[in-house]
């Protein structure tokens, strides 16, 4: 018996509605689905990056002196690892640049070793250190790759740490400004993008509150270690205060003496999270905003408005330094761009009871419980690109829509994991799609840097984790670099103009060797939706959508 037309119509409407809902779900979760390099502005750059200590090696050669990273590693706090060899970028920079060229990168973000360039922290320049940085920069430019240089990435010369305590002393402002001028003078004719300090918020918390990264200062009961050197209740605030003053001193020096001749830009990078309330209660919503004040506003509010967030000043009291009127004016507006570092999201609940404690550190002052990824785990991050889009929109709304580079993003895997890294492709596809969505929201994003190139040594508690586009064979005397699957078939293809979609990732996972297309059985839309559904189920992803952006479907979907 034939079905009545009304029944068939209702069935068709249901199928179409279901498919539309699923499409909206997947695109909302993973960001823009089908896109190519051509969908981004012409001046938008795609790059990768790393840091000097994690990639250069040659730690004891050609005049370089120890940094606080060396001291940390040699003391046994890096699970037996150190940066003595790393990826041997000091000797293999030409090979690395050729790999960048083959990958299709527009830009390379790297840091310069302070103790290699200025072995005494200040004073005479080391000719060998100068030559290495010049060689790297020239090699990049000769291959059409834009250099983005970071002045400081956790590697203060140990001599300055020994002399006056490094970042907890105001003397650092003088020495950092001197160091910055050496870099501007020597390399500024070719380097246009300068990041003064990499993720000062994370550096301060790890180095001065928990003590699990250099310079390993903390005090009980807040230490993650057995050390008792330092004071966790105020040193994180003091270190960031001096970082902000050092940054602004260097930025204004550049603007005053070099910008008109070199036409470059100075910024700073910040580690961010997508921060969402654990429940819909008023207390948790307020706590999530307070957590963002502490993580991001700690750096951005002085740069944008000249002072720390009110919540920080209220909860930390006299333990957080105050800016003088002159310092406030110097710090306010002292950036041309902001580097955003983003990997994952956090959920937050209120913990105002922590404020009753007389002895408090940064975490207690924040008065919030944090739920989310274990930053020291080998487990892969959940795929949560909507958090990045939300964060980019907050920069637009709260801080005047500054020029932004995504300075770090990527997926962590065990360092000995398979080269068939389709999971990295999934997260990269989602996050680049989220950046494209944010651009369409009118966020002022200038570039996206994947972490890391080629790979790097993680000298901290998370040593077994790799973020690299290439696998570096540490057992090979030549440190052979092998491209991972998605680098070969995803990143390179996208950067060279090929369109990418979630369907490509599904097909790549089904046939990672040939990346061949499966037979066309369904219509294009049905096949795309099927791939999307299988993608969501197969990977047992847990999505929690707490504060949807306008036009998106609010939901809480927990799968397995």
Swiss-Prot record:
Residues 1-31 form the signal peptide. Its EC number is 3.5.2.17. Its main location: membrane. It comes from the Eukaryota. Glycans are attached at residues 34, 226, 231, 347, 416, 489. It is a single-pass type I membrane protein. InterPro entries: Glyco_hydro_1 (IPR001360), Glyco_hydro_1_N_CS (IPR033132), Glycoside_hydrolase_SF (IPR017853). Highly expressed in uninfected root nodules. Detected in leaves, stems and roots. Keywords: Disulfide bond, Glycoprotein, Hydrolase, Membrane, Peroxisome, Purine metabolism, Signal, Transmembrane, Transmembrane helix. Belongs to the glycosyl hydrolase 1 family. This is Hydroxyisourate hydrolase.
């Amino acid at each position: 018996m034939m079905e009545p037309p009304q029944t068939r119509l209702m069935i068709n409407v249901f199928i179409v509605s279901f498919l539309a809902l699923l499409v909206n779900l997947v695109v909302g979760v993973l960001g823009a689905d089908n896109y190519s390099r051509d969908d981004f502005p012409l001046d938008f750059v795609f790059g990768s990056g790393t840091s000097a200590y994690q990639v250069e090696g040659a730690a004891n050669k050609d005049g370089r002196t120890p940094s606080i990273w060396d001291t940390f590693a040699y003391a046994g706090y890096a699970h037996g690892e150190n940066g003595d060899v790393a990826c041997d970028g000091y000797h293999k920079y030409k090979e690395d640049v050729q790999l960048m060229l083959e990958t299709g990168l527009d830009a390379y973000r790297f840091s310069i070793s302070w103790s290699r360039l200025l072995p005494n922290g200040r004073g005479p320049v080391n000719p060998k250190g100068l030559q290495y940085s010049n060689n790297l920069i020239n090699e990049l430019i000769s291959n059409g790759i834009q250099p983005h240089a970071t002045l400081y990435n956790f590697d203060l010369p140990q001599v300055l740490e020994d002399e006056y305590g490094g970042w907890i002393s105001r003397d650092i402002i003088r020495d950092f400004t001197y160091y910055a001028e050496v870099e501007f003078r020597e390399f500024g004719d070719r380097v246009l993008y300068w990041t003064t300090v990499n993720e000062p918020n994370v550096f301060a918390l790890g180095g001065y509150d928990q003590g699990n990264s250099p310079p390993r200062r903390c005090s009980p009961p807040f230490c993650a270690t057995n050390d008792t050197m330092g004071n966790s209740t105020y040193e994180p605030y003091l270190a960031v205060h001096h970082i902000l003053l050092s940054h602004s001193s260097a930025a204004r020096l550049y603007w005053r003496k070099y910008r008109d001749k070199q036409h470059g830009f100075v910024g700073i990078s910040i580690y961010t999270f997508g921060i969402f309330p654990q429940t819909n209660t008023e207390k948790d919503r307020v706590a999530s905003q307070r957590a963002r004040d502490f993580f991001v506003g700690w750096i951005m509010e002085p740069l944008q408005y000249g002072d720390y967030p009110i919540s920080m000043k209220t909860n930390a009291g006299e333990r957080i330094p105050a800016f003088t009127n002159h310092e406030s004016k110097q710090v306010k507006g002292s950036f041309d761009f902001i580097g955003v570092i983003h990997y994952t999201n956090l959920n937050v609940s209120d913990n105002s009871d922590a404020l009753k404690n007389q002895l408090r550190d940064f975490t207690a002052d924040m008065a919030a419980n944090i739920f989310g990824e274990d930053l020291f785990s080998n487990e892969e991050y959940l795929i949560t690109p909507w958090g990045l889009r939300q964060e980019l929109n907050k920069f637009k709304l709260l801080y005047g829509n500054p020029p932004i580079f995504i300075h770090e993003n990527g997926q962590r895997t065990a360092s000995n994991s398979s080269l068939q890294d389709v999971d990295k492709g999934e997260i990269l596809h989602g996050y680049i799609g989220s950046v494209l969505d944010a651009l369409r929201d009118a966020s002022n994003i200038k570039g996206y840097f994947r972490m890391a190139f080629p790979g790097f040594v993680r000298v901290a508690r998370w040593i077994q984790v790799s973020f690299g586009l290439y696998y570096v064979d540490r057992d090979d005397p030549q440190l052979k670099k092998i491209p991972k699957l998605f680098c070969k078939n995803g990143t390179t293809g996208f950067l060279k103009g090929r369109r990418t979609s979630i369907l490509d990732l599904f097909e790549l996972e089904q046939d990672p060797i040939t990346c061949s297309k499966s037979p066309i059985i369904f219509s294009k839309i049905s096949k795309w939706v099927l791939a999307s559904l299988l993608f969501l189920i197969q990977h047992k992803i847990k999505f929690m959508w707490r504060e949807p952006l306008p036009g998106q479907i609010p939901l809480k979907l927990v799968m397995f």
